[in-house]
């Protein structure tokens, strides 16, 4: 008889907004996930990454600003999202694995770096609204706009970068995710809804 499958979604701020908060949140979260696995469920875990992407984006920008002599360039939002999927998955993998081993359960836990295709005509590309990164001064906002980035004013606070959040059309790595679930492994994927990509011939 096939096992029941469940998707556990860790929503906005469920893993905190910085590294210590994430570490603290992983423990009880992993225990809940282990409860489902122990009772016979196959589990796929998805998670938000908005605070983490903002933190990485800010850090990469400040690295460029503080060390111009090194020739660093700002990291695209897609790269920041990929980095966040990696380190969130790393913490979740280890937390879930530990929770299972303490119960005598031996299962592989894997993170899939996940991309999702998007419609090039999605409204979000033309009218971005998702806020990321720290609040900026007016001068910093002007510099961001000069680089081609979109910025919105936050009343009473300052300015913040805004990015597109298109609706996913398809998961690029869906076959890998299904293969791992079919092998009775725990899968962590679709961090932040997946990294939006556009199909351009054979390239993404």
Model region roles, listed by residue range:
Residues 10-11, 49, 114-116, 191:
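Active-site-proximal beta-strand/loop segments in catalytic clefts of secreted hydrolases
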Residues 63-187:
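Ligand-binding beta-strand-loop-alpha-helix segment within the catalytic cores
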């Amino acid at each position: 008889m096939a096992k029941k499958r469940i998707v556990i979604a860790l929503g906005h701020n469920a893993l905190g907004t910085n590294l210590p908060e994430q570490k603290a949140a992983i423990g009880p979260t992993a225990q809940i996930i282990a409860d489902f696995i122990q009772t016979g469920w196959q589990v796929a875990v998805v998670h938000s990454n908005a605070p983490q992407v903002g933190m990485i984006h800010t850090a990469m920008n400040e690295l460029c600003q503080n060390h111009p002599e090194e020739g660093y360039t700002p990291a695209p939002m897609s790269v920041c999202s990929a980095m966040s999927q990696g380190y969130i998955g790393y913490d979740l993998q280890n937390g879930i694995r530990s929770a299972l081993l303490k119960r005598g359960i031996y299962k592989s836990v894997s993170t899939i770096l996940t991309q999702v295709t998007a419609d090039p005509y999605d409204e979000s590309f033309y009218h971005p609204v998702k806020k990321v990164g720290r609040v900026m001064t007016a001068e910093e906002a002007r510099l961001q706009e000069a680089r081609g980035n979109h910025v919105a004013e936050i009343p009473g606070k300052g300015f913040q970068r805004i990015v597109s959040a298109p609706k996913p059309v398809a998961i690029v790595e869906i076959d890998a995710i299904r293969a791992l679930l079919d092998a009775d492994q725990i899968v962590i994927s679709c961090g932040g809804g997946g990294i939006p990509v556009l199909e351009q011939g054979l390239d993404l």
